[in-house]
Amino acid sequence: MTHTTLFTSESVSEGHPDKVADQISDAVLDALIGQDPNCRVACEAVVKSGMVFVAGEITTNAWADVEQITRNTVLQIGYNDPHLGFDGETCAVVTAIGKQSPDIVMGVDGREDQELGAGDQGLMFGYASRETNVFMPAPITYAHRLVRQQALLRKNGRLPWLRPDAKSQVTLRYENGKPVAADCIVLSTQHSPEISQESLREAVIDEIIKPIMPPHWLDKHTRFLVNPTGRFVIGGPVGDCGLTGRKIIVDTYGGMARHGGGCFSGKDPSKVDRSGAYAARYVAKNIVAGGLADRCEIQVSYAIGVAEPTSISVETFGTGKIDEVRIQQLIKEHFDLRPGKIIEELNLLRSIYKATATYGHFGREEPEFTWERTDKAEILREAAGLAAANVTN
């Protein structure tokens, strides 16, 4: 008997207000960590109409022109015209930046790297599955690809009436746990006022949706909802206030896996909200790539100032090829999840973070996304006593 379900995930473009804020936060981090790998950064941004407010706690020997970094980021996204209501050249940039609390410093700094204490308490999740060639859930993967395609066509001038703000939403039909068809695809994009709804709908379906979605998933039952309100001229920070860290499900697994609640952007890797989540993805992906399970969710937790995780747990949703207790043992044998060792193994003290602030932190194939490597898949497979796995990444 076929068991049919639907699952939906969404993504947002680089011009979405919350993503503008994320990119500013990570651009500041990149500027500092490139000069001072041991900097401590917790940088937040708020964007609205003609203003950007950058605040947080930063302790570093480096210097960064936060105002200019902010302006450059806004301009690179595409807010470069006063007629859009938000322009990187003319917007106000206000900063309120202090130093990291000395109470936190004493638990995090001044230790050997391998004993670096976690920058805060918290729990993080990592997930991987065989739904796609990047070991990610299919709905979030294609939602990201749709808004990336929107940005590409906007920037290369093929659809010159596109504007930076956009959202996508993909609902897939699953049969016995596998995606088989697209039930509904939503694409809302900001646009210039002169384009008609009819022309916009046709172009979005033909130029954005169909080139990205697998053709065998699109059938007569697939619903296309393009700018469902009929008009999306006012957008970006004019239409909505943007805030760093408000798109944590977009940043991760699109709701297919659990989330510990901590955001990533603007945080240096001593913050386990970021490095712990990256490490958990690394572990989960290698477990699936190694053939130990078809789906895997890892939870890891930390206490502030303590290097060793307070817990590590594994869930394979009935797809495990070996017992979950054994998988947990293999994790402890082959992965060092102390923050200092995570930072070292994944080479996180680099200016790599602005690229993560759009289109998801996971399932990416760029080389700087070191937590996407599957270099331990074969080691895990052999340790588990399994036949060769099909490792595609």
From Swiss-Prot:
Its EC number is 2.5.1.6. Keywords: ATP-binding, Cytoplasm, Magnesium, Metal-binding, Nucleotide-binding, One-carbon metabolism, Potassium, Transferase. L-methionine binds at E57, Q100, D240, K271. Pathway: Amino-acid biosynthesis; S-adenosyl-L-methionine biosynthesis; S-adenosyl-L-methionine from L-methionine: step 1/1. Pfam families: S-AdoMet_synt_C, S-AdoMet_synt_M, S-AdoMet_synt_N. InterPro entries: ADOMET_SYNTHASE_CS, S-AdoMet_synt_C, S-AdoMet_synt_central, S-AdoMet_synt_N, S-AdoMet_synthetase, S-AdoMet_synthetase_sfam. Binds 2 divalent ions per subunit. Binds 1 potassium ion per subunit. Residues 100-110 are annotated as: Flexible loop. It catalyses: L-methionine + ATP + H2O = S-adenosyl-L-methionine + phosphate + diphosphate. GO terms for molecular function: ATP binding; magnesium ion binding; methionine adenosyltransferase activity. PROSITE patterns: ADOMET_SYNTHASE_1 (PS00376), ADOMET_SYNTHASE_2 (PS00377). Its cofactor is Mg(2+); K(+). GO terms for cellular component: cytosol. It is found in: Cytoplasm. CDD domains: S-AdoMet_synt. GO terms for biological process: one-carbon metabolic process; S-adenosylmethionine biosynthetic process. SUPFAM superfamilies: S-adenosylmethionine synthetase. K(+) binds at E44. Mg(2+) binds at D18. Homotetramer; dimer of dimers. PANTHER family: S-ADENOSYLMETHIONINE SYNTHETASE (PTHR11964). Catalyzes the formation of S-adenosylmethionine (AdoMet) from methionine and ATP. The overall synthetic reaction is composed of two sequential steps, AdoMet formation and the subsequent tripolyphosphate hydrolysis which occurs prior to release of AdoMet from the enzyme. Belongs to the AdoMet synthase family. This is S-adenosylmethionine synthase.
